[in-house]
Amino acid sequence: MARSNQTARKATGGKAPHFAMRVWQHSTPPLKKPYRYKPGTVALREIRKYQKTTDLVIRKLPFQRLVKEIAQSLKADLRFQTGAVSALQEAAEAFMVGMFEDTNLCAMHAKRSTIMPKDIQLAKRLRGDRV
């Protein structure tokens, strides 16, 4: 390729002066991205939190509405004492915790860390419940 001579030219346009950019950058504060934890970190934190507490996980009023709705389908005009609903809730949560423990064991046996519907079905079959 042939060489060509460079000639001096008068600057017309081009980049803006550097100090003007600095003024523009500092006029608006930068938006901070929200921090994201690695996948699984928040789940492990929640597991540890709920294992420490003995509180009920399901809220009382939604559970009470569910009990009344199921009872309404069986027989009309049934009323429940507060203690009866809380005893039902305690038993339901104890059953669910045990069920999820067995389900987790089934998933671990299959060399998985994620539970699947087939794990619940296997846990119910091993417990003797109907599928």
Swiss-Prot record:
The modification N6-acetyllysine is found at residues 10, 15. The modification N6,N6,N6-trimethyllysine is found at residues 10, 32. CDD domains: HFD_H3 (cd22911). InterPro entries: Histone-fold, Histone_H2A/H2B/H3, Histone_H3/CENP-A. Expressed in roots, seedlings, leaves buds and open flowers. The modification Phosphoserine is found at residue 27. Pfam families: Histone (PF00125). PROSITE patterns: HISTONE_H3_2. The modification Phosphothreonine is found at residue 12. PANTHER family: HISTONE H3 (PTHR11426). Core component of nucleosome. Nucleosomes wrap and compact DNA into chromatin, limiting DNA accessibility to the cellular machineries which require DNA as a template. Histones thereby play a central role in transcription regulation, DNA repair, DNA replication and chromosomal stability. DNA accessibility is regulated via a complex set of post-translational modifications of histones, also called histone code, and nucleosome remodeling. This is Histone H3-like 4. It comes from Arabidopsis thaliana.
